[in-house]
From Swiss-Prot:
Any Pfam family the entry gives: MSSS
Record's keyword annotation contains ATP-binding: yes
SMART domains: MUTSac, MUTSd, SMR
InterPro entries in alphabetical order: DNA_mismatch_repair_MutS_C, DNA_mismatch_repair_MutS_core, DNA_mismatch_repair_MutS_sf, MSSS, MutS, MutS2, P-loop_NTPase, Smr_dom
Species the sequence originates in: Bacillus cereus (strain B4264)
Residues the record lists as binding ATP: G335, P336, N337, T338, G339, G340, K341, T342
UniProt record similarity statement: Belongs to the DNA mismatch repair MutS family. MutS2 subfamily.
One GO MF term: ribosomal large subunit binding
GO biological process: mismatch repair; negative regulation of DNA recombination; rescue of stalled ribosome
EC number: 3.1.-.-, 3.6.4.-
PANTHER family named in the record: OS10G0509000 PROTEIN, OS10G0509000 PROTEIN-RELATED
Name of the protein in its database record: Endonuclease MutS2
Record-linked Gene3D superfamilies: 1.10.1420.10, 3.30.1370.110, P-loop containing nucleotide triphosphate hydrolases
Length: 786
């Protein structure tokens, strides 16, 4: 494909927009090297592939391409024996995870009945390297640091380092806190110079501490001295750090060697995910410009329905129907300048280039396009200053080149053919050039403002005239392409609308020939007839589509109703049974807990209450629900409830005491040792006489209440985790724990954020923080309870 054609049709601007939808540098590299194909089979496959990716986006909204980076150079370095850095190894692990995740994503969709044969073929080439991926992530943290657990030796060395640092700091801090030190030190701090711990000593007291001077302040008044008493400790610390560095290098070399062993597979996987990134970028771009998959034919004709230029705002562009190659092989668009002829010409060219690049094009469904071996375009004023060529000469140089190369597999686009010279000679040249290209079997779209070419379409069987509609009322083009209607100047109508007198206009009409007037009148009537015919056709087509859509919708609804009816009934029954079973299990757990507490003599619970509660749950679920509804209706509290009131909780048949109102319809109720939320409609007020001494609510304190000091939420779903946090905090408060730990892991951070958002609202939480280095760091939240 000629570079000049790609430039004048703004193909690279389309590629720039396509680049915005890539997820990695791998995909961007593919886009930068994208050129139109001329192979029919390849183009069909590319269109089908883009269509499958577009289907994925319609169903899922996106594709999991995050975390993928260009690791090819790193893998090649590993292959020749270079040691990779922690971040380079982490990039490799993340890319391996991304490729594995993408493979699983496509295969899961296919397993669920989504037809994606081409994408399945792509992901089938991805080889999972899970073991290598885990080895890297087990040794290297998210921040690119080699973690303590990378090896037992590294863990031991870092323990030594922390111990040595602690001893050094302790000694130095004791020195800085002494009363004598205040006058000798510039500041009571411990700092580091040249990787050794030092203290800032005033110049005049340098001999007091002995040791080694490592640095001085800009003024020279302060010396950073390593006191003699910690020199040996600092030496031991440095030795440990050297060992740490050596062990880290050993681990990195080991991991690099593992990568080198699998280098060919890793590189192959990278190529697959690069192609997938490229494919999905095409699909996302299609969604952005509202493009569809064209039918690609091998019969040298195109039928672009409601075609739009992809670089023009779809809100302002006027779509057009453009057909070429069946009933006619050449379209000559005539009419005045600034009427949108060039936009129409470029729309044809860019749609063909996009389609042959595997991109969907901005047209309606069922549009067709063919494959051209060559696309030639002579558009715009590109005269060469160096060659001192005029506008006409510049165009003619390009046209000569086109005439030498154009054949029956070519698409030729001429903009203002014959312009830039004497109108009569220019029109004659334009006709001859069109005849030459048409005789070679090429498909041609040409624009011109020469009136002589209006008759050209009527004298040649394979040529048709066209024009861009002009609205005389608004004095502006509508940009609507009218196939079969030649353009006219509209000069008389425009002048009349602008106020020129009828007398002057009539005199002007007398100056042109009768034949010309007849032709203009004929064109006007033809234009009006075409408008009416097109309007009627559009109305009929709209009604047909509406009827077909309604028919399809009714059929779909009937099928769905018949298919889903039994399934929904079964699902509802199953869900009901699951809820009842879950309620039974929960009640069993409560009963078991109460019995254990009774054995520990921490609560006063009667056997007949346990048996009665269990017997109610053992009954049929519909009966239980029915009884509860009746009870709720008959026993809804009529009295204004207050904190401290005694109530009967109908679900359990137990008495409780109101603690506080948590919402318009719910109270926090203490039932024995348990505290729970209960709706007002599910409780019955008990009228008890006031006593001079309040009866204490049963509480549980001390170590005998077996609640763990930490709650592990790793692997839990978000909703389940929040429910466990709520119950755990209640239990911990009952056990009088001052501090507990909640383990949520690092992960994506969603669970961690959810836990901390909940802690902010919990009344029993005094404060909370992340765990320290020995407590689990960012993977743990330590909670101080009130």
């Amino acid at each position: 494909m000629l570079e000049r054609t790609l430039r004048v049709l703004e193909y690279n601007k389309v590629k720039e927009q396509l680049l915005e939808h890539t997820a990695s540098s791998l995909g961007r590299d593919k886009v930068k090297h994208l050129v139109p194909s001329t192979d029919f089979e390849e183009i069909v496959e590319m269109q089908d592939t883009t269509d499958e990716a577009a289907k994925v986006i319609r169903l899922k909204g996106s594709a999991p391409l995050g975390g993928i980076t260009d690791i090819r150079s790193n893998v090649k370095r590993a292959k020749i024996g270079s040691m990779l850095s922690p971040n380079e190894l982490l990039d490799i692990a993340n890319t391996m995870y991304g490729s594995r995740n993408m493979k699983r994503f496509i295969e899961d969709m296919a397993d669920n009945g989504v037809e994606l044969p081409i994408l399945e073929t792509h992901v089938a080439q991805i080889v999972s390297l899970y073991d290598l991926e885990k080895k890297i992530t087990n040794c290297i943290g998210d921040g690119g640091e080699v973690v303590d657990s990378a090896s037992d030796k590294l863990r031991g060395i870092r323990t030594q380092i922390r111990t040595a640092e602690s001893r050094i700091r302790e000694k130095l801090e004791n020195m800085t806190r002494s009363s004598n030190a205040q006058k000798m030190l510039s500041d009571s701090i411990v700092t580091i110079r040249n990787e050794r711990y030092v203290i800032p000593v005033k110049q005049e007291y340098r001999g007091v501490y002995g040791g080694i001077v490592h640095d001085q302040s800009a003024s020279g008044q302060t010396l950073f001295i390593e006191p003699q008493v910690i020199v040996e400790l600092n030496n031991a610390l440095q030795e440990a750090r050297v060992k740490e560095k050596q062990e880290i290098e050993r681990i990195l070399l080991m991991l690099t060697e593992e990568v080198a062993v699998e280098a060919d597979i890793v590189l192959s996987n990278v190529e697959v995910v690069a192609n997938l990134d490229f494919i999905f970028a095409k699909a996302f771009y299609a969604k952005r410009i509202k493009a569809t998959k064209p039918i690609v034919n091998n019969e040298r004709y195109m039928d672009l329905r409601q075609a739009r230029h992809p670089l023009i705002d779809p809100e302002i562009i006027v779509p057009n129907n453009i057909m070429l190659g069946k009933d006619f092989t050449t379209i000559v668009i005539t009419g005045p300048n600034t009427g949108g002829k060039t936009v129409t010409l470029k729309t044809v060219g860019i749609c063909v280039l996009m389609a042959q690049s595997g991109l969907h094009i901005p047209v309606m469904d069922e549009s067709e396009i063919c494959v051209f071996k060559n696309i030639f375009a002579d558009i715009g004023d590109e005269q060469s200053i160096e060659q001192s060529l005029s506008t006409f000469s510049s165009h003619m140089v390009n046209i000569v080149d086109i005439l030498e190369k154009a054949d029956f597999e070519s698409l030729v686009l001429f903009d203002e053919l014959g312009a830039g010279t004497d109108p009569q000679e220019g029109a004659a040249l334009a006709i001859s050039i069109l005849d030459e290209v048409c005789n070679r079997g090429a498909r041609v779209v040409a624009t011109t403002h020469y009136p002589e070419l209006k008759a050209y379409g009527y004298n040649r069987e394979q040529v048709i005239n066209a024009s861009v509609e002009f609205d005389v009322n608004t004095l502006s083009p509508t940009y609507k392409l009218l196939i079969g209607v030649p353009g006219r100047s509209n000069a008389f109508e425009i002048s009349k609308r602008l106020g020129l007198s009828d007398r002057v206009i009539e005199q002007a009409r007398n100056h042109i020939s009768t034949d010309t007037n007849k032709i203009e009148n004929m064109i006007a009537k033809l234009e009006e007839s075409q408008k009416n015919a097109e309007r009627d056709w559009n109305e009929a087509e709209a009604l047909r589509k509406q009827s077909e859509k309604l028919h399809r919708e009714l059929q779909r609804q009937i099928i769905e109703f018949n298919e889903d009816r039994d399934e929904r009934l079964l699902k509802a029954q199953k869900e009901g049974e699951e809820k009842v079973e879950a309620a039974k299990k929960e009640a069993e757990g409560i009963i078991q807990e109460l019995r254990q507490l009774r054995k520990a003599q921490l609560a006063n619970v009667k056997d007949h209450e346990l048996i009665e509660a269990k017997s109610r749950l053992e009954g049929a679920a519909p009966e239980l629900v029915k009884k509860q509804k009746v009870n709720v209706k008959n026993t809804a509290p009529k009295q204004q409830l207050r904190a401290g009131d005694e109530v009967k909780v109908l679900t359990f048949g137990q008495k409780g005491q109101l603690l506080e109102k948590v919402s318009d319809t719910e109270w926090s109720v203490q039932i024995g040792i348990l505290k729970m939320k209960v709706k007002e409609s599910n409780m019955e007020y008990i009228n008890t006489p006031k006593q001079t001494e309040k009866k204490a609510v049963a509480t549980v304190k001390g170590r005998d209440y077996h609640v763990s000091l930490e709650l592990d939420l790793r692997g839990e779903r978000f909703e389940n985790a929040m429910a466990r946090v709520e119950k755990y905090l209640d239990d911990a408060q009952l056990a009088s724990y001052p501090r507990v730990s909640i383990i949520h892991g690092k992960g994506t951070g969603a669970l961690r954020q959810g836990v901390q958002d909940y802690l902010k609202k919990h009344r029993g939480v005094k404060t909370f923080r992340y765990g320290d280095m020995g407590e689990g760091g960012l993977g743990v939240t330590v909670v101080e309870l009130k």
